Amino acid sequence: MADSVRFPCMPFPPCFLVCTRDDIYEDEHGRQWVAAKVETSSHSPYCSKIETCVTVHLWQMTTLFQEPSPDSLKTFNFLPRTWRLESRNTYRGADAMHWRLVNHSQFYGTEELVLMLDSR
């Protein structure tokens, strides 16, 4: 009898994320998410068209830094203050922009969401 391979169970992505600090968001379960990386590129693995692509990498963190870095204040100030999950793979920002959930994974215990600005 062959052993079956078991993969860790991924929780559902958050229903909403509310900005509590410049680069920190909180979900409906009180979990903290940090905007770890923002990429702006015309050549991205997430973009299929030739256009500017904005992707945000959010990491669920159990321990946060006390103070935001000065660089994050400049880099992330254009992100929406709130994201709400509208469908299985689309978030709507407080600014009415749509963000596509392109990846929800876990790597070495860190849960990650990758959102891409959808240019509808």
From Swiss-Prot:
Pfam families assigned: TCL1_MTCP1
PANTHER family: PROTEIN P13 MTCP-1 (PTHR14060), T-CELL LEUKEMIA_LYMPHOMA PROTEIN 1B (PTHR14060:SF2)
Disulfide bonds: none
UniProt protein name: Protein TCL1B4
Family recorded in the similarity comment: Belongs to the TCL1 family.
Gene Ontology MF terms: protein serine/threonine kinase activator activity
Gene3D superfamilies xrefs: TCL1/MTCP1 (2.40.15.10)
InterPro entries: TCL1_MTCP1, TCL1_MTCP1_sf
Highest taxon, organism lineage: Eukaryota
Lineage summary: Eukaryota, Metazoa, Chordata, Craniata, Vertebrata
